[in-house]
Amino acid sequence: MRILLAAAECAPMIKVGGMGDVVGSLPPSLIKLGHDVRVIIPGYSKLWNLLEVSSEPVFRANTMGNDFSVYEAKHPIHNYVIYLVGHPTFDSGHIYGGEDEDWRFTFFASATAEFSWNCWKPQVLHCHDWHTGMIPVWMHQDPEVSTVFTIHNLKYQGPWRWKLEKMTWCPWYMHGDHTMAAAMLYADRVNAVSPTYADEIKTHEYGESLEGLLNYISGKLRGILNGIDLNEWDPDKDKVLPAQFNIKNLESRLENKIILQKEMGLEVNSKKYLLGMVSRLVDQKGVDLVLQVSRRLLAYTDSQIAILGTGDRSLESGLWQLALDYPGRFSVFLTYDDSLSRLIYGGSDAFLMPSRFEPCGISQLLAMRYGSIPIVRRVGGLVDTVLPHDPENNSGTGFCFDRFEPIDFYTALVRSWEAFRHKDSWKSLQLRAMSQEFSWQRSALEYESMYKDVCGIKAPSPDIAEIEKFSYGQSADPSLKTM
């Protein structure tokens, strides 16, 4: 099949969140299955310094009253084709934000549609998040191109209908309330990035006011778990780590722990229980829970906590105060550092992910791969990837809690600390976690199956009368038919 992935990010060149990992890492696994897979992204100015870009465009056209050009490049690691949509709107230096963000990504979506019709025509056009949400609307009229839309984070939904009408001249019934709704209505298949998240977003608690629409389209909705690049993330070959290790020489991992303690200003003692966290410091990630339980945990146990990330100023301030109050036991680096993040994965004893919601989550997969035991809230992709530790049956890969409450999180932390004191059992837990298989090849087989199901097939056009029922804020109604 000819498959084109359209997105705002593609790792490693352009990456803000998990979407960049998916778009960068999924194509090579699909190519191994025999498909012609390419990616199209906005032509951010920095890319011309990071990639070898064709001197002449492969396509020129005009859309939304603006001329644009499409250039060809190759992925720097995997060597597949990447198309860059060139226009001055992408020269600002930032990926997200800015006063023209809505217009910028709607223009990118329109340019991608023009390119797909008139230059390189895919059989499947795979769109990612609201930035590409209008593509399924425009491609719906083409019987030769099937569209797939992936929801990475339902919270971000794109420009509203009045702005879309002004920018695209499409009447409201062609896109519903916003670009996220547009994509879900017109895409031939829709998937979320984990099976549990696909179920959760059909409920009021996690539906972000789109649960009614998601129940309506549930017949074409599924969940496919993200993966990780096992070659890029391999503790046995990771040159960033002071000491490489695998399941056969786990003892070497202690050297990483000692160096992590030194680098983050913690007391150097390999027997201390060291909790790590690499995260955006925002409410979604449960940082407020960390703030609420840390003092009690440090008072009751001999634990240490090492946190790396940036985000909300108030959360950063709270973490900084804890570091001042508990020198040698609590450390926070308010930045992002790839080398230090790898050291936290490869040196901490356990890894914190007390998320409010988590569409899939990559960090828990990396933590397990590197022998750091995840402590997670049972939500979204964390349910699908972390199995609760059961010492009696010698099973499980992490510690889990259900409610987003400090006492529940604290209880899970204490259980993990107590388990850490039993070295043989803890080592068995580490070995089980490190043996889990979350490769992109597994995910690629599921995406391939979905592509085959949809290739050459168009979902029925949405019923305008039904669309009217799903204005913003509409609750789910299980009696409604599904597409």
Curated annotation (Swiss-Prot):
An annotated Gene Ontology molecular function: alpha-1,4-glucan glucosyltransferase (UDP-glucose donor) activity
InterPro entries recorded: Glyco_trans_1 (IPR001296), GS/SS (IPR011835), Starch_synth_cat_dom (IPR013534)
EC annotation from Swiss-Prot or TrEMBL: 2.4.1.21
Reactions performed catalytically: [(1->4)-alpha-D-glucosyl](n) + ADP-alpha-D-glucose = [(1->4)-alpha-D-glucosyl](n+1) + ADP + H(+)
Gene3D superfamilies reported in the protein's UniProt record: Glycogen Phosphorylase B (3.40.50.2000)
Residues that bind ADP-alpha-D-glucose: 15
Sections of the chain in a coiled coil: none
Keywords, sorted A to Z: Glycogen biosynthesis, Glycosyltransferase, Transferase
Pathway: Glycan biosynthesis; glycogen biosynthesis
Any Pfam family: Glycos_transf_1
Superkingdom field: Bacteria
Annotated family: Belongs to the glycosyltransferase 1 family. Bacterial/plant glycogen synthase subfamily.
Name of the featured protein: Glycogen synthase
Organism annotation: Prochlorococcus marinus subsp. pastoris (strain CCMP1986 / NIES-2087 / MED4)
